[in-house]
Amino acid sequence: MSIVNKPAAVKAGTGKGLTIERIYTTAGVHPYDTVKWERRDVVQTNWKSGEVIFEQKGVEYPEFWSVNASTIVTTKYFRGALGAENREWSLKQVIDRVVLTYTKAGKEHGYFATPADAEIFEHELTHMLMHQIFSYNSPVWFNVGTNAPQQVSACFILSVDDTMESILNWYKEEGF
């Protein structure tokens, strides 16, 4: 099997890409400006001993986000070592890391009919993520927007041929 590098389906800027319709957002208004943001401390403790096992103070979330949701995102998806200067501290940074990476790739590969369509795509995704209408799977949050190429799917599928040898090898590889 060989992998062929194909050029983008549509040359960027030709106007032949996707036209995106606004559903949740308003032209000229960034989604972040439509909600009230607050700073909060995220603290996790050992349920038996009460010992603090994680703490990041002053993280930023929309005020309507639950403590549980902000704890999960802060402890699992913020990039950077805890206490390091480059550690993410706001949901805006996490959303931007992913959404801006996908929007940039879409622009580079001609997925959008116009620059306005790219902005609508960015704003709609930002709104939906901020309002928890949908979420990406963990590998996207862990890896998109990082310097090294990473896997962004939640599972790795091994191909299997329609032969007994291939099927048995699949079992061996999968650890059954």
How should these model regions be labeled?
Residues 1-176:
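Extended catalytic cores of very large enzyme megasubunits
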